Swiss-Prot record:
GO terms for cellular component: cytoplasm. Belongs to the ferrochelatase family. Its main location: cytoplasm. It comes from Leifsonia xyli subsp. xyli (strain CTCB07). It is an enzyme of class 4 (lyase). Fe(2+) binds at H205, E303. Pathway: Porphyrin-containing compound metabolism; protoheme biosynthesis. This is Coproporphyrin III ferrochelatase. Involved in coproporphyrin-dependent heme b biosynthesis. Catalyzes the insertion of ferrous iron into coproporphyrin III to form Fe-coproporphyrin III. Pfam families: Ferrochelatase (PF00762). SUPFAM superfamilies: Chelatase (SSF53800).
Length: 389
């Protein structure tokens, strides 16, 4: 397996032998930090697709609305500091390096720093919880590309923590947020009965339907049965939404999984329904208020600020709905602790039976399965921390 440690280079789904990692690689998406950065950043995001700058400028307006600055970099700086503080509080000597896929500091910068400091074994934590090409395999491909670009293949090995969609550290902040949102609605509109007048909308990034169908391995880990519509990506979100709904409301408030931030030509099918379309349908069902849960996101980055806090809130107002948006995990203490626990899980080779997961789909694989999360348009490229292809 390209670029992985020997412990992760076998065919086992989970690694249960200790690995002496030298550092943590916090792998982010990246974002512009000024107006002049916006178009170059979007060129990086869309590299290889042949998208003209005129089309990129349409998306750029979302960033320009906020001064050309994406909040994601400051959020990752805060997460890096929170991880370092959590590690220090436990007496764990693991430096945290930070590198992005699409903007400074790049993954190649982090690998160069690792080499300069004599680090040879890195455990990566990507800022994405679910299984799909863009949220898992593309990170692994970018690790491989950065190793090639820096000439560090064979000198630095990179493993990656499992997808943590159903880890308590990721899920519990959402449960807490929904509970708080229900209370907020009770205070703001006591006349609205939660069971009949409130709807929870769990929102995540839409992806092409063909890519969704290729997300995850070929069958469900809990039953071996084929995935339904939307593949592992949709199934993971549905499973987590069910847990959050049950734990936060006892299942008394209805909910939907909705999608946002789609791009690409209208002729290409993407996962639906769009959150704004669903919002427009709710008044006819007697819904008076909604709770928006950004279930697919780890921090309040541009897709949350624009697509939810701007567009979805405008849709809610246009349709006469009271709306509350739940926070993302961000630097919530449970989330930060959970990420460190995931690192230690791999460092110590924790037995699978001792690994926490809140759905029957987990704990997810340490080593990605062959053919996992194919990009149908681009095909397979070299990737670390998973089996070929």
């Amino acid at each position: 397996m390209l670029g992985a440690t020997p412990a992760a280079a076998g065919v086992a789904e989970h690694v249960t032998e200790p690995v002496a990692y030298d550092a943590i690689l916090l792998a982010g998406f990246g974002g512009p930090e000024g107006q002049d950065d916006v178009i170059p950043f979007l060129r990086n995001v869309t590299r290889g697709r042949g998208i003209l700058d005129e089309r990129l400028e349409e998306v750029a307006q979302h960033y320009r609305h906020f001064g050309g600055v994406s909040p994601i970099n400051d959020q990752n700086r805060a997460l890096k500091a929170a991880l370092e503080a959590e590690l220090a509080s436990r007496g764990i000597d693991l430096p945290v390096l930070w590198g992005n896929r699409n903007w400074d500091p790049y993954l190649a910068d982090a690998l160069t720093e690792a080499d300069q400091r004599g680090f040879t074994k890195l455990i990566a934590v990507a800022t994405s919880a679910y299984s799909s090409y863009s949220s898992c395999r593309q990170y692994r491909e970018d690790f491989a590309r950065a190793l090639r670009e820096t000439g560090l293949e064979g000198r630095i090995q990179i493993d990656k923590v499992r997808q943590f969609f159903d880890h308590p550290g990721f899920v519990e902040p959402f449960i807490e947020g929904v509970k708080n949102a229900v209370e907020e609605l009770r205070e703001r509109a006591p006349e609205i009965h939660p069971a009949t007048g409130v709807r929870i909308l769990f929102s995540t990034h839409s992806i092409p339907s063909t890519d969704a169908g290729k997300s995850g391995p070929s069958g469900r880990p809990d039953s071996g049965e084929p995935w339904g519509e939307g593949g592992a990506y949709a199934a993971q979100h549905l499973a987590v939404a069910e847990i959050v709904s049950h734990e936060a409301t006892g299942g008394t408030i209805g909910w939907d999984l909705v999608y946002q931030s789609r791009s690409g030509p209208p002729s290409m099918p993407w996962l639906e329904p769009d959150i704004n379309d669903r919002i427009a349908e709710l008044p006819e069902l007697g819904v008076k208020a909604i709770i928006i849960v950004p279930l697919g996101f780890v921090s309040d980055h541009m897709e949350v600020l624009w697509d939810l806090d701007t567009e979805a809130m405008e849709s809610s107002e246009e349709n006469g709905l009271l709306a509350v948006r739940v926070p993302t995990p961000g630097t919530h203490a449970k989330y930060v602790k959970g990420l460190v626990d995931l690192v230690l899980e791999r460092r110590d080779g924790l037995p699978v039976a001792q690994r926490p997961s809140l759905t029957t789909l987990g704990p997810w694989y340490d080593v990605c399965r062959p053919g996992c999360c194919e990009n149908v348009r681009l095909g397979f490229k070299p990737a670390v921390a998973g089996l070929t292809p």
